Amino acid sequence: MPSIFWTGKLSPTTKLMANFSNAIAWITGNARDSAAMKERVKKGYEGAVTDDVKRYDEFGLHHFTRISKALLEGIDLQGKAVLDVGCGTGILSLLALEQGCAHAVCGDLSEYMLGQCREKANALGYGPDRIDFRMLDAESLPFESNSFDAVISGMVLGFIPNQKSTVVEMVRLLRPGGVLAVSTHGPELYYEAIEVSFRSVPKHIVLGYRIEYWPRKEKDINRMFSEAGLIDVRTRQLTWKDSFENGNSAYEFFASTSAMWWCTKFSPDKIRLVSQKIRTAFERKPVKQITTDIILAYGRKPS
């Protein structure tokens, strides 16, 4: 079941406002409708809110490559069969292939993002003997148990309502001795951008809406992995700040990499209003730094 309250960093006033809205969302059922939540995230990454998502790699490639390299430093994928849950444009999957994995299955909820991954793989000359593509839901993965040597996932878990059961599902697919490696959203990820966005959106539009986002502390992810039956569990936190020339550049990074999925809850006219208010707020403040806060987590399925 999704968490009711906001789990990331916000200023005290903004967090109070967010949690008041979340409580209403729980009572009305919005915060318990996992299927609708996942559908909104999917629509966001298919461009329902902003065309900026089409510039995902333009603004986010360096950022997500840094995260992906940090994640894969902790495991050996040489000759392994790998599943990438929530592959996006394929940054993590293609890096795994570059580092010697035998075969990668790239899975994502968004048809658009999966298509981008396929195009990049084809351009690099990877055929079906090395890579495959599947539309999938991370909470119900369409594979037999014990199918993969490694399951990897980059910056996806924070968008999933039922995180504990998702980790259990990933572990189910591992062969004995297989490795799960995940990067996910820490409490301060994009803090400055989220704070400005929350404050700039008209409150009557978002009241009673629980945004589909659940960042976690390092100890929470460690516990999830251990409770899912993994051994040799280890985690580490990775943080830095990205700097931008001006507020508009910061907004373009945030809009393209987040796809502003939460706005899919709104009608088209309100989407335009909210998007413009957020952009204007970024420019006026101006937002010139955005925090990256990542949890890297690893665990092994007992042999």
Task: Describe the role of every protein-language-model region.
Residues 107, 154-157, 183:
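Residues lining the SAM
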Residues 164-179:
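A short glycine-rich, Lys/Arg-flanked "PGG" loop and its adjoining helix->strand segment in the class I
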Residues 83-85, 89-140:
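Class I SAM-dependent methyltransferase SAM/SAH-binding core
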Residues 5-8, 14-31, 60-62, 89, ...:
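Conserved Class I S-adenosyl-L-methionine
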Residues 150-162:
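A short SAM/SAH-binding and catalytic strip from SAM-dependent methyltransferases
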